[in-house]
């Protein structure tokens, strides 16, 4: 890894106003996907997230609850970090703006700008929203309240929150001084703001009409960072909050090595705070003599059919509910695949369940199940590239190369949905390849053995590549794919990913489906009920309607009565010479003499002596058969198979040997 191959990505720091819903998780997962991708591409990566913990709103809320702000904040900070853990977020640092190092660095930066005359003391009079922690002019208000005389008494901010009139002494930042510089910077760095439409909004709506100076401090509350030279002022939230992206790296501290190493980086934000990040933030950095971020990417909102998520609307989706019922990877996949990053997207339970069934269960899950089954069935679990190709191999390998190339291009442009669509193009093409080559037909002829093995290799290798590309999005799923393909590796670098891996171990036996199919009607109803805050009633049990999961045809009770099941105590057990699968049991099954049974379970019981004294369940009236030329097996030991493992069936110790089962 070269020293300058670094990557720094940040989420906005979240405001601790209660339980985070799926929208906040959306941003954090997107940044995590990008961070994981860059690490797999060999970049020294640093991923920052955290909480914005100062301000009037927090102070008021804590006072209402009879708590200090810190007492109010600490449990919420712990809850957010626990949620990120559930979402498998691989952040490198979690910043809280109440951290001492951050407060000290912000205070130093403020004093520097004050000395440079970029900040001056003045008086502010205007409309302020406590909820938004933002000042508004009358023209910016969505609605204005007036008294009988026509005087303005209040109003509604664009966010829907009420504003109040504020008059107080404040320090201002000379934003207008840097307006021309900022426009020139935009021109010289056309990719600085993404998507492009966000830049046009900033230029036309805020900069060209005249950039107003920005209030930086408040005196009407105390929960903030005091200005060292005038402690009755506390630093206003946006100067405090924006600097977190560099203070977390050690800026203005005794150890700024990470700052020198990683800055500038990429700030990922929601479109509602794009103005603060694309106008105020680069100007503040420029005034401090620091480079602007490499890029500000302002993504869209995750909406419901009836607009933004809101408890009052009964349409809030919490990620914990989805993870608990459908698994983390299904949630991460849906958010990154169903929504074009940068645009608004709509979450619907129907689309969510449909994606799981069609994309994950049908396309990916089915391909893995079929591939593992055929490799075990037709080639004893071995994956071999024989070089005897079919007429479809060249076009398939071409799709692999195109998929890898397109995937990297999409990831570099933050087009996560496009990157996943590329992977599914490969998965779909590989499913088609099975139908084209018909391995079950090739298996009928020994002459086609080499061609069959080559087909199986292509299936396994395409799954490996798909699994590798899915690592940033669905780490656990990738691991399951690698495991079922019998691979020791649980992670693959993406730097030089290409077709042609050498498989060295047998494929494991087919496990449980990685994504079981869902009952659409039932799951959609469940999600909608949870969104409304309800509890799903237990489904009435109707035995006659239960679909039995059977692998063999049903038998009549008369047939079952022909089988005699007994309890047998293990007296002795030893490996059978010349076989690595068989164990030879000497059993007390209530007969006049001990009986002998040979069972192919040696690989599951490397210490076979642990079975001595156990009381097993056996089929006692199975016709004796000769095995290994010199042994007679007088029955069958019953066992259960699960996840590629096997366990003998036992009974309680106080059940006598020879007891009938049934």
UniProtKB/Swiss-Prot annotation:
Catalytic activity: tRNA(Met) + L-methionine + ATP = L-methionyl-tRNA(Met) + AMP + diphosphate
MF GO annotations: ATP binding; methionine-tRNA ligase activity; tRNA binding
InterPro entries: Anticodon_Met (IPR041872), Met-tRNA-synth_bsu_C (IPR004495), Met-tRNA_synth (IPR014758), Met-tRNA_synth_2 (IPR023457), Methionyl/Leucyl_tRNA_Synth (IPR015413), MetRS_core (IPR033911), NA-bd_OB-fold (IPR012340), Rossmann-like_a/b/a_fold (IPR014729)
Subcellular location field: Cytoplasm
Binding, ATP: 311
Chain location of the short sequence motif 'KMSKS' region per the record: 308-312
Chain span(s) of sequence motif 'HIGH' region: 14-24
Enzyme nomenclature, EC number: 6.1.1.10
Biological process per Gene Ontology, one example term: methionyl-tRNA aminoacylation
Pfam entry (one): tRNA-synt_1g
Keyword ATP-binding on entry: yes
Cellular-component GO terms for this entry: cytoplasm
Keywords: Aminoacyl-tRNA synthetase, ATP-binding, Cytoplasm, Ligase, Nucleotide-binding, Protein biosynthesis, RNA-binding, tRNA-binding
Location of the tRNA-binding domain: 559-662
Subunit structure: Homodimer.
PANTHER family in alphabetical order: METHIONINE--TRNA LIGASE, MITOCHONDRIAL, METHIONYL-TRNA SYNTHETASE
Family: Belongs to the class-I aminoacyl-tRNA synthetase family. MetG type 2B subfamily.
Role description: Is required not only for elongation of protein synthesis but also for the initiation of all mRNA translation through initiator tRNA(fMet) aminoacylation.
Designated name of the protein: Methionine--tRNA ligase
Gene: metG
């Amino acid at each position: 890894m070269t020293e300058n191959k670094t990557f720094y990505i940040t989420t906005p720091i979240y405001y601790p106003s209660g339980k985070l819903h799926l929208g906040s998780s959306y941003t954090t997962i997107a940044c995590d996907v990008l961070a994981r991708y860059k690490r797999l591409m060999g970049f020294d990566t640093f991923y920052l997230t955290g909480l914005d913990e100062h301000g009037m709103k927090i102070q008021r809320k804590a006072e209402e609850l009879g708590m200090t702000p810190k007492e109010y904040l600490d449990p919420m900070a712990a809850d957010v970090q626990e949620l990120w853990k559930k979402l498998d977020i691989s952040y490198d640092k979690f910043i809280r703006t109440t951290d001492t190092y951050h407060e000290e660095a912000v205070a130093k930066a403020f004093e520097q700008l004050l000395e440079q005359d970029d900040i001056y003391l003045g008086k502010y009079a205007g409309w302020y929203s406590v909820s938004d922690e933002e000042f508004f002019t009358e023209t910016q208000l969505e609605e204005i309240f007036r008294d009988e005389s026509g005087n303005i008494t209040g109003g509604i901010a664009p966010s829907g929150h009420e504003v109040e009139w504020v008059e107080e002494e404040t320090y201002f930042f000379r934003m207008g001084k840097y307006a021309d510089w900022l426009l020139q910077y935009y021109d010289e760095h056309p990719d600085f703001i993404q998507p492009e439409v966000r830049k046009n909004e900033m230029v036309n709506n805020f900069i060209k009409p005249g950039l107003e100076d920005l209030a930086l401090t408040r005196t009407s509350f105390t929960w903030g960072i005091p200005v060292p030279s005038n402690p009755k002022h506390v630093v206003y939230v946006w100067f405090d909050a924006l600097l977190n992206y560099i203070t977390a790296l050690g800026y203005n501290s005794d150890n700024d090595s990470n700052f020198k190493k990683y800055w500038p980086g990429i700030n990922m934000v929601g479109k509602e705070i794009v103005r603060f990040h694309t106008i105020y933030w680069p100007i503040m950095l420029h005034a401090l003599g620091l480079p602007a971020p490499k890029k500000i990417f302002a993504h869209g909102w995750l909406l419901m059919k009836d607009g933004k998520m809101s408890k009052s609307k009964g349409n809030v989706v919490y990620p914990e509910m989805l993870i608990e019922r459908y698994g983390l990877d299904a949630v991460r996949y849906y958010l990154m695949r169903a929504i074009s990053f940068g645009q608004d997207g709509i979450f619907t339970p129907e689309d969510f369940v449909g994606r799981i069934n069609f994309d994950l269960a049908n396309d990916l899950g089915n391909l893995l199940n079929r591939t593992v089954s055929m490799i075990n069935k037709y080639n004893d679990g071995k994956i071999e590239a024989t070089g005897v190709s079919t007429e479809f191999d060249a076009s398939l390998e071409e799709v692999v190369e195109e998929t890898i190339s397109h995937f990297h291009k999409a990831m570099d442009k933050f087009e996560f949905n496009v990157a996943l669509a590329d992977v599914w193009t490969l998965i779909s093409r590989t499913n088609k390849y099975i139908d084209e080559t018909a391995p079950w037909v090739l298996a009928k002829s020994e002459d086609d053995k080499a061609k069959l093995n080559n087909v199986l290799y292509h299936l396994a290798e395409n799954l490996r590549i798909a699994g590798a590309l899915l690592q940033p999005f669905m780490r656990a799923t990738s691991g399951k794919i690698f495991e079922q393909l019998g691979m020791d590796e649980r992670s693959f670098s993406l730097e030089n990913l290409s077709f042609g891996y050498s498989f060295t171990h047998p494929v494991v036996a087919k496990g449980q489906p990685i994504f079981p199919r869902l009952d659409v009607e039932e799951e959609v109803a469940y999600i909608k009920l949870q969104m409304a805050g309800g509890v799903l009633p237990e489904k009435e049990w109707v035995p006659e309607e239960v679909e039995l999961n059977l692998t063999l045809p049903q038998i009549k009770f008369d047939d079952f009565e022909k089988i005699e099941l007994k309890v047998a105590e293990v007296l002795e057990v030893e490996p059978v010479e010349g076989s690595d699968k068989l164990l030879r049991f000497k059993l007390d099954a209530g007969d006049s003499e001990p009986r002998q049974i040979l069972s192919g379970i040696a690989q599951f019981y490397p210490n076979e002596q642990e079975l001595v004294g156990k009381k097993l369940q056996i089929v006692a009236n199975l016709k004796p058969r000769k095995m290994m030329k010199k042994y007679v097996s007088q029955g069958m030991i019953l066992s259960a198979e699960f996840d590629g493992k096997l366990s003998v069936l036992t009974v309680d110790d106080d059940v006598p040997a020879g007891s009938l089962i049934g």
